[in-house]
Amino acid sequence: MLMGLAVSDQPEGPYRDLRTPWFDPGYSTIDGHLFVDADGTPWLYFSRNGRRDGYDYGTIYGVRLSDDLLSPVGEPVMLLEADQHWELEIRDWNRCNEGPAVWRDGDRYVMTYSANHFMYTGYGIGVARASHPLGPWTKDPANPLAASNPAIGVSGPGHNSVVLSPDGTERFMVYHAHADPAAPSADRVVYIDRLQRDPVSGWWRLHGPTRSPQPAPKG
């Protein structure tokens, strides 16, 4: 599986295919995330997924892109792999980091990502940070950022995008979780919850998952 690149003059489309495949590094690539830094430099983050030694794996890579977005500049660099305890609960058959989303927070870069198998109740979202787009990246020791909560009917929160409120003062995570917690599958429902920075550690915290009404975004 390889990624493609499509463009449009409007977010809602229509989109036209610009390049398919985008590029071929010689392995399967999914979950592409485009991040443009404050200086205009474009970066691509994606997941490499496959199978080795009897288990499925996923690792997160990053690479700088040409200014026209058409080609990688240099070779992709591996940034994250499953290495925290919560990411290795099913290590005998799955060791996965995938679904990266990156944004800039002052002089730091923040990445939110998914870990474990997408149909497993332990599928969740972690957070890491770095001082350069290609790392080294450090994971929050307090991960996961988002996890299943059977008490309120939330199972397997994963993948995500991070967006600002209309007035730019709040961050929100848009992510999905299993539609039926009693029978986890590829069917999902969408959640939106607030992110806030811990004033002591500097790490971002998710106020969720929630299933009750929340205050509207500011602005």
Q: Which residue stretches match the model-derived regions?
A:
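Carbohydrate-active catalytic/glycan-binding domains of CAZyme proteins
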Residues: 1-219
